[in-house]
Amino acid sequence: GYLGGYAGYAAAPAAYAAAPAAYAAPAYAAPAVVKTAYAAPAIVKAAAPAVDYYSYPKYAFEYGVNDPHTGDVKRQWEERDGDVVRGEYSLLEPDGTTRTVTYTADAHNGFNAVVHRSGPSAHPAPAPAVAVPAVAKYVAAAPAVVKSVGYGGYGYH
């Protein structure tokens, strides 16, 4: 036992209780299984989606640019009637030719474009080679070795 100044630890308890004679685990009951009947979903044929226009799509536009200062030369036109779109645009290529693209688009054929080039192709002559004078090689003298003068007052020699 404990021999210090607290008497509550000086001796063992006067009696011990005996272990229980038998142990019964709690009973477990599995939840009841409820059978649910399922029916196959009914097959419904979907109707083709109806085209619902707020207003019938119909437009036409055309524009062109001819800026000699920047060299920007182009034009375009397009028209739509329902689900059919037709149009054409052209632009001046850097080599001087004109590229023209004619296109159509509809629900049956999709988008189709035909590209044409017209006009003479003008390529600038290559710039003449410029002769660059050779740079003279720089030659430097090797550094001279100089014996150090000691610093006698500071203990360096």
UniProtKB/Swiss-Prot annotation:
Identify a single GO molecular function assigned to this protein. structural constituent of cuticle
Chitin-binding type R&R domain sequence ranges: 56-127
Identify the Pfam families for this entry: Chitin_bind_4
InterPro entries on file:
CHIT_BIND_RR_consensus, Insect_cuticle, Insect_Cuticle_Struc_Prot
Q: Does the keyword Transport apply?
A: no
> Which UniProt keyword terms apply here?
Cuticle, Repeat
Record flagged with keyword Nucleotidyltransferase: no
Q: According to the record, where are the sequence repeats?
A: 11-14, 18-21, 24-27, 29-32, 39-42, 47-50, 141-144
Which sequence ranges form a coiled-coil region, renumbered to this chain? none
Q: GO CC: one term?
A: extracellular matrix
Q: What is known of its domains?
A: The tetrapeptide (A-A-P-[AV]) repeats found throughout the protein are also present in many proteins constituting the protective envelope of other species.
Task of the protein: Component of the cuticle of migratory locust which contains more than 100 different structural proteins.
Q: What is this protein identified as? A: Cuticle protein 19
Q: Which organism is it from?
A: Locusta migratoria
